[in-house]
Amino acid sequence: KRVKAWWSERGIEITGMQALLFGTSGLNVFGTADVQEAMLAHLEAVCRIGAGLGSVRIVFGSPKNRDRSGLTDHEAMEIAIPFFRRLGDIAAIHGTFICLEPNPPCYGANFMTTSAETAHVVQEVSHPAIRMQLDTGSLRINGENVSISLEMYADLIGHVHLSEPDLLPLGDGGIDHAKVRAALTQYLPGQLVTIEMVATKDEPHIVSIERALKVAVRHYRSNECEALA
């Protein structure tokens, strides 16, 4: 509550969480039963903390923690579906929801690497607390069309990340944000969107953050779509 209040006093609302498994070791959706139990226990704590912060959107990226090496597509789904249903139950208890994020292979992923694959998992899990994440950087890397993806999967999407390939500052990766904005306005009006980027090495962080915010405000800040860092 203190953390939430501190940010609120400064006009910032905490709306989502990611890097859910940062600092952990050996956790994998496709691990043994004991590994799965440990992973779910950790994610239960994340959901509890998220609920306390008002962060209801819990973004599950973590490509190395969904390593399906050695499994066929069918075998992977046979394991993933019950796991995510259990995770959905946990998230719902805390009033949060999980957003499964497509991570392309260049980010180290081999499961849910595209929007279509991720949407298929969400559809098969069929749980109200398991949603899909739309990530503009992943769309760009995969050569996916944002308008087509939104038209097909808008009803599955729970959160949107505005990102560039390799998590460059927003505006530095060649994404047509006017096109993204138009698609969001058409298919997900009123959807909150969030900047996702990593720290820059060749300029002060405050400079890159300010540049990214200017891009977000220019393209996304309006009555229909509001960008938050």
Which residue stretches match the model-derived regions?
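Active-site-proximal loop/turn and secondary-structure-junction residues that shape catalytic pockets
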Residues: 20-23, 64-66, 102-106, 136-138, ...
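Conserved, mostly hydrophobic/aromatic
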Residues: 7, 17, 50, 80, ...
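Short active-site-adjacent helix-start/loop capping segments
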Residues: 15, 23-28, 203
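Histidine-acidic metal/acid-base catalytic patches
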Residues: 40, 54-56, 115-134, 138-229
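Short, well-structured secondary-structure segments
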Residues: 13-17, 58-59
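Active-site acidic/histidine proton-transfer and metal-coordination neighborhood
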Residues: 9, 26-131, 141, 223
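Aromatic-lined substrate-binding rim segments of carbohydrate-active enzymes
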Residues: 1-11
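Short, flexible/disordered intra-domain loops and linkers
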Residues: 1, 108, 203-207
